[in-house]
Design a protein with these regions (language model features):
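Compact, glycine-rich, soluble single-domain proteins
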Residues: 7-101
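Short, charged, intrinsically disordered terminal tails
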Residues: 1-5
């Protein structure tokens, strides 16, 4: 018999953001978003910048995460992220500025521009703006 819930833990090096029993979650993995339900087959994936969402106490909770790893087990999902923010912690002005700086760097496309780093900055800023409804 499959469990009805699983434990979700989301942590950064600085803090534990979430530790809750939930019924489902969407997590940005290396190959796209992972839909996780109780009893999911075990897997380990790189975490991509994006939004983790899960229903909790009558509403959908959403967090922005950057790089890291996600471990999925049938009764527990652990997300270890370089950085993560709850919706109310996102600084919209800062995210908009970061997106503009990264886009400007990509437009330059000279030898001096670290394209991969600029693309990563675009993904992080886009995820932050998406979670607060600005994209």
């Amino acid at each position: 018999m499959l469990p009805e819930t699983f434990k979700l833990e989301i942590a950064t090096p600085e803090r534990l953001l979430v530790s809750a029993d939930i019924k489902e979650a969407q997590i940005p993995g290396e190959g796209g978003y992972l839909g996780i339900l109780p009893g999911h087959a075990p897997l380990l994936s790189a975490l991509q910048p994006g939004v983790i969402s899960f229903p909790r106490e009558g509403h959908t909770e959403r967090l922005v995460v950057t790089w890291g790893y996600v471990e999925v087990l049938p009764t527990k999902v652990t997300v270890l992220a370089e950085a993560a923010e709850k919706v109310e912690e996102v600084d919209v002005g800062r995210a908009e500025q970061a997106l503009q700086r990264a886009m400007d760097r990509l437009k330059q496309a000279t030898v001096d521009v670290d394209v991969a780093r600029a693309q990563a900055a675009v993904r992080r800023a886009t995820a932050r703006l998406h979670v607060v409804g600005k994209l």
